[in-house]
């Protein structure tokens, strides 16, 4: 099995000097200087805590009740075909469907979303329900195995063994749902990997409660076929590959397969290569969605837990030192209200710090915040490996202007403004037509931000959210960036940044400069075409009420002859201007930001309602020159409110 992955020397395109020395104020090194730790399990201490501490006793009562309710109520079925977790979206607006454990068509006749109380249960949505159910079911197996280990309840061990037998006996009866994709229990190998981690943990927890011959059958009928599937795919640097290598490594630890362990770590696309080649010099995952920092961190954390309990965490020392920074790096990007920028295609706007995440990983990546948060939590982690008392609280790092050239991003901060500039991409995966996009905050108030995307299964994902019109970018004939490209950082200073995309589209060069000047934020955008006059323009989006001058007329012809994404705007009006338009954006609370857009000659300005984070919408502008031209420069100036708290 190990030999299914070819081994080769990894390269390191992103220099990462001294990972262990980064963010020192948030790390708690031990006597050997390691800021990561090997997880422990104290079962005797756990039994004492649930016996002597009333709060822990109550927690145990609730945990047993939840597991028992699930155990007597639910059984997976071979005839249930799995779907894609991203398919669980409303056909109305792409908002997430609400999952619960009621069986579709048997116990409930509709699904629902925040915007739609009755969503038809189609085969595709039923398959979405199955994939979530199956993941929950496997998680319940782990919880039941822990309860058995804690209390000695043999009925729980019998149930877990029975479930493992069910999956092993029937594994090959689940046919892969996509040609060329070997996942069986789930729709994709990513979900196969993240749940294989749970299966592995359930068997580990059973320990001697599962006879050797039964473990051998599980290995032969289930674990080895899963390993073969995971090792046959994702031969690349990718977030999914991280999960697959980490899952296989945990199977290797469970069954003592050292060759498999070595290959999962040291293979050409093993874990070491994934982190060396997939994490930028700014300690951001190269696919750029900031959510992938935590996603990759969780994969490494799952392996680190297993390795620590097996006495082998030290073999992962350099990788753990690097992964620790994935937790901390987003702190330097946060806006004053704690929100994070949203480059690429994350499904929601993140926050930093994320206390729940810091608490979740404290057993391997302790931080003052993580220990403090974990100290408030009662769960299996804090029962088995109680968090140490946190040291004195640490202040979050001050966000300052910063060039993140390794990640193709920059931050400007000054005079009440904070800007996040995303000028290029490093990989095709998860990229959007958003090169040269920027987000702007005035103090704690978002003026313009990237909403991310909806579930990948929604037509709005590729049809709107991934397209240029959804971003603050230059447009040519209504189209933005084609493909993906690193772009060129042409200059950076604490109060100004400039970058270009020489091949923004075939025959098109685009460039943008952002500057903090005399209290204002000034955006200068240039477009040049090599193939003659084109319709040149740009899009701008706002989180407040746009107060435009004069009378606009309804633009019934708005989407005619334009790319698909234009059809998602509603209530569109239009007016023609010459050289400049001035208006205000009302952010609420008496804060109104004056905005002026300058353009060469006559232009049309459309205003409309566009999709925001579902189910919300926002006010958006599209500017386009009346006459086609071969080049144009647009200057947008945002001035500070006359009297506003920062």
Q: Where do the model's predicted regions map?
A:
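Secondary-structure capping and boundary motifs in well-ordered enzyme cores
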Residues: 136, 188-195, 240, 267, ...
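Extracellular glycan-targeting catalytic surfaces
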Residues: 11-236, 242-249, 301, 343, ...
């Amino acid at each position: 099995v190990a030999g299914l992955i070819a081994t080769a020397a990894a390269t390191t395109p992103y220099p990462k000097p001294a990972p262990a020395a980064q963010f020192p104020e948030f790390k708690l090194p031990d006597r050997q200087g390691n800021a990561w730790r090997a997880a422990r399990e104290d079962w005797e201490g756990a039994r004492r805590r649930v016996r002597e501490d009333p709060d822990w006793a109550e927690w145990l009562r609730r945990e047993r009740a939840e597991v028992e309710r699930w155990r007597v109520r639910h059984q997976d079925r071979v005839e249930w075909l799995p779907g894609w977790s991203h398919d669980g979206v409303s056909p109305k607006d792409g908002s997430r469907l609400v999952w619960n454990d009621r069986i579709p068509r048997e116990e409930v006749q509709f699904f629902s979303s925040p915007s739609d109380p009755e969503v038809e249960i189609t085969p595709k949505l039923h398959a979405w329900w199955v994939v979530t159910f199956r993941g929950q079911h496997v998680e319940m197996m782990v919880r039941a195995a822990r309860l058995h280990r804690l209390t000695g309840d043999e009925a729980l061990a019998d149930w877990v063994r029975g479930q493992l037998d069910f999956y092993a006996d029937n594994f090959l009866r689940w046919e892969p749902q996509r040609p060329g994709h070997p996942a069986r229990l789930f729709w994709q190998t990513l979900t196969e990997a993240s749940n294989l981690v749970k299966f592995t943990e359930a068997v580990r927890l059973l320990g001697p409660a599962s006879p050797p011959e039964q473990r051998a059958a599980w290995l032969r009928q289930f674990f080895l076929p899963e390993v073969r599937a995971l090792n046959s795919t994702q031969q690349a640097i990718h977030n999914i590959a991280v999960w697959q290598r980490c899952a296989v490594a945990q199977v290797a630890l469970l069954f003592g397969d050292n060759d498999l362990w070595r290959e999962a770590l040291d293979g050409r696309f093993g874990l070491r290569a994934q982190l060396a080649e997939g994490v930028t010099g700014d300690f951001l995952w190269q696919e750029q969605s900031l959510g992938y920092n935590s996603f990759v961190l969780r994969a490494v954390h799952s392996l680190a837990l297993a390795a620590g309990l097996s006495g082998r965490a030290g073999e992962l020392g350099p990788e753990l030192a690097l992964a620790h920074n994935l937790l901390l790096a987003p702190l330097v990007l946060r806006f004053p209200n704690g929100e994070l920028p949203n480059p690429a295609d994350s499904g929601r706007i993140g926050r930093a710090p994320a206390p729940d995440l810091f608490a979740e990983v404290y057993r391997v990546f302790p931080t003052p915040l993580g220990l403090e948060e974990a100290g408030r939590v009662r769960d299996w982690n804090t029962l088995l490996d109680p968090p140490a008392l946190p040291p004195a609280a640490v202040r979050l790092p001050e966000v300052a202007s910063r060039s993140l050239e390794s990640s193709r991003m920059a931050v400007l901060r000054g005079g009440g403004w904070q800007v996040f500039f995303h000028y290029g991409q490093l990989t095709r995966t998860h990229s959007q037509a958003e090169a040269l996009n920027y987000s702007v905050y005035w103090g704690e108030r978002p003026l313009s931000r990237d909403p991310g995307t909806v579930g990948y299964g929604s037509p709005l994902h590729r049809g709107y959210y991934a397209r240029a019109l959804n971003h603050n970018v230059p447009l040519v004939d209504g189209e933005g960036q084609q493909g993906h490209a690193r772009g060129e950082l042409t200059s950076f200073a604490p109060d100004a940044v400039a970058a270009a995309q020489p091949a923004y589209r075939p025959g098109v060069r685009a460039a943008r400069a952002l500057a903090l000047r005399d209290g204002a934020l000034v955006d200068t955008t240039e477009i040049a075409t090599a193939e003659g006059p084109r319709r040149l323009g740009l899009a701008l989006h706002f989180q407040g009420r746009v107060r435009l001058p004069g009378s606009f007329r309804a633009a019934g012809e708005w989407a005619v002859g334009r790319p698909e994404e234009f059809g998602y705007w509603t209530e569109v009006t239009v007016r023609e201007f010459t050289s400049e338009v001035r208006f205000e954006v009302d952010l609420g609370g008496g804060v109104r930001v004056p905005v002026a857009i300058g353009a060469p000659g006559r232009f049309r300005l459309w205003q409309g309602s566009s999709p925001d984070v579902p189910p919300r919408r926002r006010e958006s502008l599209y500017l386009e020159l009346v006459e086609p031209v071969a080049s144009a420069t647009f200057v947008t100036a945002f001035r500070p409110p006359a009297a506003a708290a920062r």
